[in-house]
């Protein structure tokens, strides 16, 4: 199956802005993150897993990595990783 992955903000420094990833049918959100870590490095995984500081969107809906890591993905899903902006 193919999953469309978008990286926004500072995560674009670790990976490309947009990419189609081919995964095994039924692969989970966590497996996608593990694959991305192997492709782009551990730095990206650390950034993504800072769940309290980042948004993960699946088809436009917010996902909590702590509770939805094993959620199976579907062909054509769109997963976006969006860091929350901070500053003052």
Map each language-model feature to its residues.
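Ubiquitin-like/PB1-type beta-grasp interaction modules and other compact soluble beta-rich domains
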Residues: 1-87
């Amino acid at each position: 199956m193919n999953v469309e992955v978008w990286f926004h903000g500072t995560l674009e420094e670790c990976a490309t802005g947009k990419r189609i990833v081919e995964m095994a049918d039924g692969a989970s959100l966590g497996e996608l993150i593990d694959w991305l870590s192997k492709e782009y490095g551990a730095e990206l995984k650390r950034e993504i897993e800072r769940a309290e500081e980042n948004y993960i969107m699946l088809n436009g809906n917010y996902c909590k990595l702590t509770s939805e890591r094993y959620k199976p993905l579907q062909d054509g899903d769109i997963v976006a990783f969006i860091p929350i902006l901070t500053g003052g």
